[in-house]
From Swiss-Prot:
Organism: Oncorhynchus mykiss (Rainbow trout)
The protein's name: Collagen alpha-2(I) chain
Keywords: Calcium, Collagen, Disulfide bond, Extracellular matrix, Glycoprotein, Hydroxylation, Metal-binding, Pyrrolidone carboxylic acid, Repeat, Secreted, Signal
Modified residues (Allysine): 78
Record's compositionally biased regions (Gly residues): 76-88, 259-280, 334-343, 391-412, 418-427, 448-457, 511-520, 610-619, 628-646, 736-745, 787-796, 817-826, 877-886, 976-985
Function: Type I collagen is a member of group I collagen (fibrillar forming collagen).
Cysteine-cysteine disulfides: 1153-1185, 1193-1354, 1262-1307
Amino acid sequence: MLSFVDNRILLLLAVTSLLASCQSGGLKGPRGAKGPRGDRGPQGPNGRDGKAGLPGIAGPPGPPGLGGNFAAQFDGGKGSDPGPGPMGLMGSRGPNGPPGAPGPQGFTGHAGEPGEPGQTGSIGARGPTGSAGKPGEDGNNGRPGKPGDRGGPGTQGARGFPGTPGLPGMKGHRGYNGLDGRKGESGTAGAKGETGAHGANGSPGPAGSRGLNGERGRAGPAGPAGARGADGSTGPAGPAGPLGAAGPPGFPGAPGPKGEIGGAGSNGPSGPQGGRGEPGINGAVGPVGPVGNPGNNGINGAKGAAGLPGVAGAPGFPGPRGGPGPQGPQGSTGARGLGGDPGPSGQKGDSGAKGEPGHSGVQGAAGPAGEEGKRGSTGEVGATGPAGLRGARGGAGTRGLPGLEGRGGPIGMPGARGATGPGGIRGAPGDAGRAGESGLTGARGLPGNSGQGGPPGKEGPPGAAGLDGRTGPPGPTGPRGQPGNIGFPGPKGPGGEAGKGGDKGPTGATGLRGGPGADGNNGAPGPAGVVGNTGEKGEQGPAGAPGFQGLPGPAGPAGEAGKAGNQGMPGDQGLPGPAGVKGERGNSGPAGSAGSQGAIGARGPAGTPGPDGGKGEPGSVGIVGAAGHQGPGGMPGERGAGGTPGPKGEKGEGGHRGLEGNMGRDGARGGPGPSGPPGPSGANGEKGESGSFGPAGPAGLRGPSGERGEGGPAGLPGFAGPPGSDGQSGPRGEKGPAGGKGDVGPAGPAGPSGQSGPSGASGPAGPPGGRGDAGPSGLTGFPGAAGRVGGPGPAGIAGPPGSAGPAGKDGPRGLRGDPGPGGPQGEQGVVGPAGISGDKGPSGESGPPGAPGTAGPQGVLGPSGFVGLPGSRGDKGLPGGPGAVGEPGRLGPAGASGPRGPAGNIGMPGMTGTQGEAGREGNSGNDGPPGRPGAAGFKGDRGEPGSPGALGSSGQPGPNGPAGSAGRPGNRGESGPTGNGGPVGAVGARGAPGPAGPRGEKGGAGEKGDRGMKGLRGHGGLQGMPGPNGPSGETGSAGITGPAGPRGPAGPHGPPGKDGRAGGHGAIGPVGHRGSPGHLGPAGPPGSPGLPGPAGPAGGGYDQSGGYDEYRADQPSFRAKDYEVDATIKSLNSQIENLLTPEGSKKNPARTCRDIRLSHPDWSSGFYWIDPNQGCIADAIKAYCDFSTGHTCIHPHPESIARKNWYRSSENKKHVWFGETINGGTEFAYNDETLSPQSMATQLAFMRLLANQATQNITYHCKNSVAYMDGENGNLKKAVLLQGSNDVELRAEGNSRFTFNVLEDGCTRHTGQWSKTVIEYRTNKPSRLPILDIAPLDIGEADQEFGLDIGPVCFK
């Protein structure tokens, strides 16, 4: 029999397990499907004691007890009445007495549980034959029989209905031409047809009378170079010509004396973003910055390595029952059990997870190149992957299209100064940009090289006297230096103005007839004619004879532009027509190609001296004469024509700082700058409206010419530039060969035989079968309906020409014919008198580009091109190495129940117990032995990405793919080096002048002569007017990044970012320290009494005659005194009942209001005690339980803030936090007066964990203060701010997750009356509530007052 203490322990264990099951209450899930039949449970607990048997016969006396020492307990001096002594200690238990006599027959017990099935008996004798059964159900259809013999021929059937018309037949061959039909009658006049296409140009008409003078035509492009005229006699020396084009660089002079140190220039404007510099050296570790605001959730980190095993802790107390353990190892196959009852049909399982990828198949033959796919939409930016190993440098990709201009990135850290990059290849001239504002005068550049001597110019009129310049100090004359290396090209000069139009040259020989010109401009649309009635179409009449040339009709409306015709074959040279009257100067035609070199004619007799010839070819270079004295300054020459742009010069020194220009476009994105220390939390300023750009400032006055500086020494070569940025992905690689066939894996263990499943649902209809064989011809069908009208047949061959028709009406005026061939060259006319000087004409348009010059010297390597667009997707690469083993998948579902075990031995029949009361549902039994392995679990969630595998070895090169389509034209190659000039020939002697012969035909253009030697430097001309803007030069190389500016003030707090995506599961943390041992749990409930043992022998050695009968257990009659045990059990029962069904009282609090509502569904809403963190009930809190909504509401303390003028300030209005600033740093409190703030914070933290929704209201009482909507301005800029529990600010507008709603808005205007605005915030993130503070904006004046009512925070 169990003792009283044992019973209490059992009771307390039951209470503990009940507690554990009570606390783990989540939302009740849906009812699961009926599980398979379980194995037989373990033997149940023994029944209660039967009723006491009758007393047995007294046993024999027991052995004598141990003698006690009573000497110390007696006083020898007293011999009077010895009353009963004190009760001695209970002796040790005597040995078991012999069995008593059997008791009387007990009452018949209740029927026991069915015993285990007995072993199968032997097969009985065969029974008698049974009576005939009922007829069975129809069997399944038998298999089809064998085909029967072929029957005899049937009788002739009746004639069938006509068949439907057949499909149209194939198109027939073209028929022969039919005979000409007879001429039809003339049809009625048709409507006016649409204007036909322009006809071919007619033959030239007779020369018309001279027309009126047209408007002056635009200057035509320059004609081809005329033949070289005869050498004229030497003219008088002209004045100094204009400054010639820059010649090749001269030898560098010797270094001049060092100039004086100039004044410090002002800071120049920020240069363009520099190239990315080399990584700088890691700086020293800075001081620890202040704690920044919490960042967004980071991306999932890789799984950490397992930690070292910790020190073994002390053995813990028994924990609550754990969840199902992982699948155990496969047990050995048990003996086959008896067949179980058939289970119910299972529900259709979910579709299985996608299988693992199969092994790579054998490489197929290369398929044909697919069509180019559409460009996919831009994908979202992926998470930043781990940095891979640095790959080998790829080949240069094709130049991609320029991308869209990116937004300006933050200014990066100043990089180390890069070396001067090599000059790029000269680009094509861009369109002329708008005229820029005049910059400040730059520092004077290095002197340019001497230009070639220009041709002698005409003597110009004397210019106005210039202003006296400042006299510069004479510099010392340096010694003549050795010739230096050829310098870098000088800077590109400005484009000169277009020169004046030259005199009209003689008429050239008639060229070959050119191809058809481009379509002319459309003429003005003529008036639309009246539309006549549409006549019926007559048969085509024969073509009439050509009519006479009609008068020109009005111009028809412009037809649509026809496609450009193919290039016509050149026609034969026409006979020269008679010379026409000299017409007005026509528009300049395009320049003709140069004619071939004519044969050299015989030398004619010496002619009379001709007029002055053009500029002769430069003569050979004479010996360099001694330097002459400085001559007096010549007269200023006329303004010279603009020189050709010089080559690009070296980068000049930085000029003085110019005026600040307009904001430039966003620069290229810089590298990330260093993290600055977090600035102070500024208040949100109101966003100002964007200001418009100011008007451009007036052009500055031209500064005076600087003095000529001394030539500086050549600079050292710069450092090598930084490596270019990595190119984008190269084109898709060819498909690698298939991987080798993997080894065959070991055979898996045979799974257990599954039970036959239920019939599957009907499958979907299969795809349509292939086309069947043609059936036998059907009977003749009914005649079909008439077919639709067929499409027009192909055009017949053109018939023979018809007879001439009547003359047509006058046609419209023909287009202007091509110009007739030029007449023969007229004789040279007499020189006319000089005309009056005309007004200066307007500047002509830019002439056509000149012939390409000789190739310049090879340029230095240009900078890296832009990163091209991503290449097309590469073919599938080789299979990657095996990935890292993923994390274990989620626990699979429980396996199917194992086969039923063999029958156990039949137990002994138990004693019949009395019928007990129906017990409560027992606790779950201990875990049974591991079941057979379950079926494979569903595929687990994808594991975290493994760490990058080591770089695989390069695969074998794949087979050559099919030839790709032709690539785009390559970039223009670099210009080849200039060839050496040939030697100068000797100058021949001048022959005697002969008589002037007749003027010869114009010779072909001579070949271009070798470049002449450099002429002597002419006198400097006057400063020319500023030329027009030259074409935009190429973008200069990026300047050095300027030093970082001073740290700007901290920007305003940005709006809270959106919640980041939920991070992945973090790696398992290290083992924590062992917790302190928990408190001793309450004693468990007493166990059920055991079976009564046999009666022991009677004790001996104690004289019972003294009347000591206090041991109630010695005799059954004393069992009436068990009321203490009964009371204890009753008390425990009531405590367990309270745990199972909490009352919400101070002594029996519930965890949440939900527990009270589930335990007592008929109770009404009100205040109850709850203890969210469980444990000791001393920290229970009082909450309002709203059973209608399921909310647990905790009230603030205090619940209202007095209405008065809380804040006076004359500064600009800003949000002022009530608890932090106005109320002396006291936030809204939610603790009970009897609890410490720490205990309340703990309870609130558990409350947030137990809830998944939260809501709270705040009422803002106002007087002349706006709380939400500003009624005057119609915006929310004066709305209050709220502070949540996790320091998040809740606003009136912005991110919807952090905005509150308004249920009533009475505080919109300053009315002088009290009103209120009720604010509500609901969220699925309970961690944001309760509200701890409020910040009004529209306060601070003497008449502005407010107060608050803080509503309870309610969790659900």
